[in-house]
């Protein structure tokens, strides 16, 4: 019998201004080279730009964007009998949110534009409306899972 204790599940802390865990998760993914204050600056500027563009609550736009990009299912490479199959697997809510945030930031970084705050705000507004690269990535993932549904029993 193992003597190790059970590990407490880590909960994401909330950010100082909005007291929101999603904002903190987003800041931690924006973060580069340990410059967290810069990551906070970028996100807060993006939130201000969202407020100016949409004239609605920017946190609801952020939630809507992440909800729209969060995948329900993904594909995982699985080697069976010498060939590799893309096996569709269901994704939990935490992992789905993490993927959504990663896709949103990747799409924002690829966008042409002046600075990261501008690009991030544009991507979040587009995702909330149901367009943009991050939404396309989610749809592509769902299409891949649907196409490989025959391999679902390999889980």
UniProtKB/Swiss-Prot annotation:
Disulfide pairings: none
Subcellular location: Plastid, Chloroplast
GO molecular function list: rRNA binding; structural constituent of ribosome
InterPro entries from the UniProt entry: Ribosomal_uS7, Ribosomal_uS7_bac/org-type, Ribosomal_uS7_CS, Ribosomal_uS7_dom, Ribosomal_uS7_dom_sf
BP terms from Gene Ontology: translation
GO CC annotations, alphabetized: chloroplast; small ribosomal subunit
Gene3D superfamilies from the UniProt entry: Ribosomal protein S7 domain (1.10.455.10)
Main location: plastid
PROSITE patterns (UniProt xref): RIBOSOMAL_S7
Any one Pfam family match given in the protein's UniProt record, by short name: Ribosomal_S7
Keywords in alphabetical order: Chloroplast, Plastid, Ribonucleoprotein, Ribosomal protein, RNA-binding, rRNA-binding
Top-level taxon in the UniProt lineage: Eukaryota
Similarity-based family: Belongs to the universal ribosomal protein uS7 family.
Oligomeric and partner information: Part of the 30S ribosomal subunit.
HAMAP family (alphabetical): Ribosomal_uS7_B
PANTHER family: RIBOSOMAL PROTEIN S7 (PTHR11205)
Entry function: One of the primary rRNA binding proteins, it binds directly to 16S rRNA where it nucleates assembly of the head domain of the 30S subunit.
Designated name of the protein: Small ribosomal subunit protein uS7c
Record organism: Beta vulgaris (Sugar beet)
Organism taxonomic ancestry: Eukaryota, Viridiplantae, Streptophyta, Embryophyta, Tracheophyta
């Amino acid at each position: 019998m193992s003597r190790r204790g059970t590990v407490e599940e880590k909960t994401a802390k909330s950010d100082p201004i909005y007291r929101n865990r999603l904002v903190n998760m987003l800041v931690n993914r924006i973060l580069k080279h340990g410059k967290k204050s810069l990551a906070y600056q970028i996100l807060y500027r993006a939130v201000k730009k969202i407020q100016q563009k949409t004239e609605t609550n920017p946190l609801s736009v952020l939630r809507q964007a992440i909800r729209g990009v969060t995948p329900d299912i993904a594909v995982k490479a699985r080697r069976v009998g010498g060939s590799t199959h893309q096996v569709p697997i269901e994704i939990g809510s935490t992992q789905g949110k993490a993927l959504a945030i990663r896709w949103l930031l990747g799409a924002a970084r690829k966008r042409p534009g002046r600075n990261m705050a501008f690009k991030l705000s544009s991507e979040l507004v587009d995702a909330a409306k149901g367009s943009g690269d991050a939404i396309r990535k989610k749809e592509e993932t769902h299409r891949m899972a649907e196409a490989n549904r025959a391999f679902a029993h390999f889980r």
